[in-house]
Amino acid sequence: MTGVGSAVRRLYLSVYNWAVFFGWAQVLYYAVTTLLESGHEAVYAAVERPLQFAQTAAFLEILHGLVGLVRSPVSATLPQIGSRLFLTWGILWSFPETHSHILVTSLVISWSITEIIRYSFFGMKETFGFAPSWLLWLRYSTFMVLYPTGISSEVGLIYIALPYMKATEKYCLRMPNKWNFSFDFSYASILSLAVYVPGSPHMFTYMLAQRKKALAKAKAA
């Protein structure tokens, strides 16, 4: 990449990372203040718009990997972003009955803390060329608590939404139809739950390996 191309890339990624960082900072602020003032039942209504913005913006990270803007493997990025988009739009937005559950609060707090750390880390690297050691440690250590709480909340909310999927038949396609094809959203969601069984340990193991590599590299520098 040429000097000009590299500068444009860094500028774009800096703006992207800081914009999404501020989106997640809003989510965390609204989640915590609403939890303290009104209780967990009101949290989703308070965070809905910034949550949808911040999480949907993450779709661009898949494109970043595909076109070579970042070195993150798409095979690692796609499942995580895909599952979060599914929760954001396929569960929370689609089934309001889930909004008052305590798991919504644990979900958005787990996600937002994780992403505030991650986007500030990459924002610092793209903007200034480095990130402080404490931020690097947070980037590669907090997942050991926040990943299990986030995943548990995701699985729980999908499970909670299943009866409403079956009752409303939302996003279902029944036979007969001109495509000669049927689709049941509740069965697809059950399948997604099954994917969490091997997928979650795999991702956790991958992140542990990334942590070991990143902290060893920082120590040697």
UniProtKB/Swiss-Prot annotation:
Keywords in alphabetical order: Developmental protein, Endoplasmic reticulum, Fatty acid biosynthesis, Fatty acid metabolism, Lipid biosynthesis, Lipid metabolism, Lyase, Membrane, Transmembrane, Transmembrane helix
Transmembrane segments: 12-32, 52-70, 77-95, 101-121, 142-165, 185-209
The keyword Lyase belongs to this UniProt entry's keyword annotation: yes
Matching Pfam families: PTPLA
Active-site residues, Swiss-Prot/TrEMBL: Y147, E154
Pathway: Lipid metabolism; fatty acid biosynthesis
Membrane topology: Multi-pass membrane protein
Annotated disulfide bonds: none
GO molecular function annotation: 3-hydroxyacyl-CoA dehydratase activity; very-long-chain (3R)-3-hydroxyacyl-CoA dehydratase activity
Keyword Repeat: no
Ranges of the Lumenal topological domain: 33-51, 96-100, 166-184
E.C. number(s) listed in UniProt: 4.2.1.134
Catalyses which reaction(s): a very-long-chain (3R)-3-hydroxyacyl-CoA = a very-long-chain (2E)-enoyl-CoA + H2O
Main location: endoplasmic reticulum
Sequence ranges on the Cytoplasmic membrane side: 1-11, 71-76, 122-141, 210-221
GO biological process: fatty acid elongation; sphingolipid biosynthetic process; very long-chain fatty acid biosynthetic process
Alphabetical list of InterPro entries matching this protein: Tyr_Pase-like_PTPLA
GO cellular component: a single term: endoplasmic reticulum membrane
Record localization: Endoplasmic reticulum membrane
Protein family per UniProt: Belongs to the very long-chain fatty acids dehydratase HACD family.
Protein's job: Catalyzes the third of the four reactions of the long-chain fatty acids elongation cycle. This endoplasmic reticulum-bound enzymatic process, allows the addition of two carbons to the chain of long- and very long-chain fatty acids/VLCFAs per cycle. This enzyme catalyzes the dehydration of the 3-hydroxyacyl-CoA intermediate into trans-2,3-enoyl-CoA, within each cycle of fatty acid elongation. Thereby, it participates in the production of VLCFAs of different chain lengths that are involved in multiple biological processes as precursors of membrane lipids and lipid mediators.
Record protein name field: Very-long-chain (3R)-3-hydroxyacyl-CoA dehydratase PASTICCINO 2B
Primary gene name: PAS2B
